[in-house]
């Protein structure tokens, strides 16, 4: 099946959700191209960008799992590639 390039932008407000988030990201590690995390101390949040190359259904599943975490928001942007 065809894969798509996408970026999931994540904002973590609840630091207690970080271990679960890392576990989810490890589960999808084979489709992750790269990851960048930035702690924003002024607002007490972490901002994470995940670059992916995967089937649409896999990207959607990852985004849904992330959004189920307490204090974590995620949005996905798709490339036309």
What are these regions (language model features)?
Residues 1-81:
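Long, contiguous binding/interaction regions
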């Amino acid at each position: 099946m065809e894969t798509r390039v996408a970026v999931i932008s994540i904002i973590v407000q609840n630091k207690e959700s970080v271990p679960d988030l890392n576990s989810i990201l490890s589960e999808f590690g084979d489709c992750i191209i790269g990851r960048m995390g930035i702690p924003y101390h002024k607002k007490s949040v972490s901002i994470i960008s995940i670059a992916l190359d995967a089937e649409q259904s896999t990207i959607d599943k990852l985004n849904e799992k992330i959004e189920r975490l307490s204090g974590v928001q995620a949005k996905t942007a798709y490339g036309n590639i």
